[in-house]
């Protein structure tokens, strides 16, 4: 999927990385009794590449969330960076390519439409190690980039909306489960 989104040298690098990683994964799968994946969909993608003799060893797990930690009635810390105006939040590691792609896409394609209706709204991008492309989004009207925060829960619980506009990642994202829990 990454290769399909890129051009030129980056496309070649992602495609080559996929090919090498696939060879390695196939070799490792043959050496173990079971292979576990983060979702049934991910397991199916891998299973479909395997010889029939290896397919029964491949299993998908379901994501979960700590419902005690992400309890809407629980207490969480005061977080000084939580906007005082209505806001939309995105949470995640902001040096992970799929998250970077998601917030850039949202900022370009969706955020201007929201600002037309709610000029005072804030898009709060929450997560450690924001890339330079993510930091640059803070120059746009209504976009705040927090970087790493002590407690992500206030940014989820107090948001009018939590978005996960992932264009690439497969499976259920933990950020979605956390938002639904709160």
Task: Locate predicted features.
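Short alpha-helical segment that forms part of, or immediately flanks, the ligand-binding pocket
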Residues: 153, 174-182
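Acceptor-binding helix/loop patch of EC 2.4 sugar-transfer enzymes
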Residues: 1-23
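Short glycine-rich, flexible loops that bind phosphorylated cofactors or substrates
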Residues: 44, 97, 170-171
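A short, active-site helix/loop in glycosyltransferases that binds the activated sugar's phosphate group
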Residues: 22, 26-57
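Glycine-rich, N-terminal phosphate-binding loop of Rossmann-like dinucleotide-binding domains
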Residues: 39, 92, 166
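Acidic donor-binding loop of glycosyltransferase active sites
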Residues: 33, 142, 157-171, 182
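Conserved catalytic-core segment of nucleotide-activated headgroup transferases in glycan assembly
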Residues: 30, 48, 55-158
């Amino acid at each position: 999927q990454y290769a399909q989104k890129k051009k030129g040298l980056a496309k070649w690098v992602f495609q080559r990385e996929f090919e090498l990683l696939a060879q390695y994964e196939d070799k490792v799968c043959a050496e173990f009794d079971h292979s576990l994946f983060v979702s049934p969909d991910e397991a199916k993608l891998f299973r479909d590449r395997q010889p029939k003799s290896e397919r029964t060893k491949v299993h998908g797990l379901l994501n979960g969330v700590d419902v005690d930690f992400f309890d809407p009635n629980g207490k969480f810390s005061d977080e000084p960076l939580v906007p005082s105006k209505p806001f939309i939040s995105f949470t995640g590691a902001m040096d992970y390519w799929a998250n970077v792609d998601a917030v850039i896409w949202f900022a370009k394609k969706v955020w201007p439409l929201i600002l037309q209706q709610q000029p005072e709204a804030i898009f709060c991008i929450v997560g450690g190690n924001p890339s330079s492309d993510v930091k640059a989004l803070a120059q746009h009207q209504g976009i705040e980039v927090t970087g790493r925060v002590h407690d992500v829960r206030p940014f989820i619980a107090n948001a009018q909306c939590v978005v996960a506009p992932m264009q690439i990642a497969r499976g259920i994202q933990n950020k979605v489960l956390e938002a639904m829990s709160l």
